[in-house]
């Protein structure tokens, strides 16, 4: 009895890592991955509810999947953050959902499915515990024809940011043992990954002290078969400074800093229950560029938080103009029930939030155009992500997969996972065109 599953993943790379864990569990229990949702017997939706727009996207995705379910006689399974946060709503308002479970149970997905639907479950996969069989299974599981993979180093968060609902359903910070991280990295590499992205809610919180964090990163970077190591979600504090110095000493670590500041106004940061201020953030960005030549920066800002005034927005604008981060993500603040921020008087209208975001975006786009101009004719280390529509999609080491710029190359002889040099020839608003100059 061949029963197929398909996983739709919403949200951030951390969810992608969780979906890979589900994939592993389902395959181990004898289920088979489907190429398309329509051909699956079980359609999983791994959800996101970080902000209001993410919640709305989740609901729409579930409702759309419910229509597909009716046409294809599937079982619809909703998992992750939305299921953890709104179980009663799913039960009462979306009867099309056959099964739901929250965060922390991804690795048991196969067993959960078998217990819920014993008559629809295939025979459990039989294999011995030899390393060879385990690695063979892992390769089958995690080869998504992508040259990169996400490996979670922890789950949960202890920061207590007043705008963030994640700790309420992800729980307190819990780190993975180094041995488990190394195992997952090795498994992904054996499945074909050339680049490993370490992810978590708060990567720099890992370890009892800075040395534990640095030792974990060193051990991952020392894996001979690893080509590129990328560190994501680096909270802007002192441990990040030490991690940056390690990045400068370690060629395998990508020239990339992702550090979500969320704001630069001291008043707003204090209300958000976050540390740091504009001057320390400037020093952090300057240090990153000093120790890792060619490094590019990705950061994010939440605009329209309660109490934000025009002067606070001006501080964000000045910061962007002075530090010139290559990648800026802007979120419109949406109060999340159960957070401290939701208890504050909402002082900024939705219309004004949009105006402020558009103002900041326009300033950054003007800076980005100048940055693009400086890239013309320059060569960069790069990796081929895919070949589609008679073009290769290539990514510089300065760009993270699935969220940053890509470079389009008119060369279908390139192969996903190939690493070499690319020359930038032209650009769009965000993405670029280029020429592959070494294989």
From Swiss-Prot:
<dbReference type="InterPro" id="IPR005840">
    <property type="entry name" value="Ribosomal_uS12_MeSTrfase_RimO"/>
</dbReference>
<dbReference type="InterPro" id="IPR020612">
    <property type="entry name" value="Methylthiotransferase_CS"/>
</dbReference>
<dbReference type="Pfam" id="PF18693">
    <property type="entry name" value="TRAM_2"/>
</dbReference>
<feature type="binding site">
    <location>
        <position position="81"/>
    </location>
    <ligand>
        <name>[4Fe-4S] cluster 1</name>
    </ligand>
</feature>
<dbReference type="GO" id="GO:0051539">
    <property type="term" value="F:4 iron, 4 sulfur cluster binding"/>
</dbReference>
<feature type="domain" description="MTTase N-terminal">
    <location>
        <begin position="3"/>
        <end position="118"/>
    </location>
</feature>
<dbReference type="InterPro" id="IPR038135">
    <property type="entry name" value="Methylthiotransferase_N_sf"/>
</dbReference>
<dbReference type="GO" id="GO:0035599">
    <property type="term" value="F:aspartic acid methylthiotransferase activity"/>
</dbReference>
<dbReference type="InterPro" id="IPR007197">
    <property type="entry name" value="rSAM"/>
</dbReference>
<comment type="similarity">
    <text>Belongs to the methylthiotransferase family. RimO subfamily.</text>
</comment>
<keyword id="KW-0808">Transferase</keyword>
<feature type="binding site">
    <location>
        <position position="48"/>
    </location>
    <ligand>
        <name>[4Fe-4S] cluster 1</name>
    </ligand>
</feature>
<feature type="domain" description="Radical SAM core">
    <location>
        <begin position="143"/>
        <end position="370"/>
    </location>
</feature>
<feature type="domain" description="TRAM">
    <location>
        <begin position="373"/>
        <end position="438"/>
    </location>
</feature>
<keyword id="KW-0479">Metal-binding</keyword>
<dbReference type="InterPro" id="IPR006638">
    <property type="entry name" value="Elp3/MiaA/NifB-like_rSAM"/>
</dbReference>
<dbReference type="GO" id="GO:0103039">
    <property type="term" value="F:protein methylthiotransferase activity"/>
</dbReference>
<keyword id="KW-0963">Cytoplasm</keyword>
<dbReference type="InterPro" id="IPR012340">
    <property type="entry name" value="NA-bd_OB-fold"/>
</dbReference>
<dbReference type="GO" id="GO:0046872">
    <property type="term" value="F:metal ion binding"/>
</dbReference>
<dbReference type="GO" id="GO:0005829">
    <property type="term" value="C:cytosol"/>
</dbReference>
<dbReference type="GO" id="GO:0006400">
    <property type="term" value="P:tRNA modification"/>
</dbReference>
<keyword id="KW-0411">Iron-sulfur</keyword>
<feature type="binding site">
    <location>
        <position position="164"/>
    </location>
    <ligand>
        <name>[4Fe-4S] cluster 2</name>
    </ligand>
</feature>
<keyword id="KW-0004">4Fe-4S</keyword>
<keyword id="KW-0408">Iron</keyword>
<dbReference type="Pfam" id="PF00919">
    <property type="entry name" value="UPF0004"/>
</dbReference>
<feature type="binding site">
    <location>
        <position position="12"/>
    </location>
    <ligand>
        <name>[4Fe-4S] cluster 1</name>
    </ligand>
</feature>
<dbReference type="InterPro" id="IPR002792">
    <property type="entry name" value="TRAM_dom"/>
</dbReference>
<comment type="function">
    <text>Catalyzes the methylthiolation of an aspartic acid residue of ribosomal protein uS12.</text>
</comment>
<dbReference type="InterPro" id="IPR023404">
    <property type="entry name" value="rSAM_horseshoe"/>
</dbReference>
<keyword id="KW-0949">S-adenosyl-L-methionine</keyword>
<feature type="binding site">
    <location>
        <position position="161"/>
    </location>
    <ligand>
        <name>[4Fe-4S] cluster 2</name>
    </ligand>
</feature>
<dbReference type="Pfam" id="PF04055">
    <property type="entry name" value="Radical_SAM"/>
</dbReference>
<dbReference type="InterPro" id="IPR013848">
    <property type="entry name" value="Methylthiotransferase_N"/>
</dbReference>
<protein>
    <recommendedName>
        <fullName>Ribosomal protein uS12 methylthiotransferase RimO</fullName>
        <ecNumber>2.8.4.4</ecNumber>
    </recommendedName>
</protein>
<dbReference type="InterPro" id="IPR005839">
    <property type="entry name" value="Methylthiotransferase"/>
</dbReference>
<feature type="binding site">
    <location>
        <position position="157"/>
    </location>
    <ligand>
        <name>[4Fe-4S] cluster 2</name>
    </ligand>
</feature>
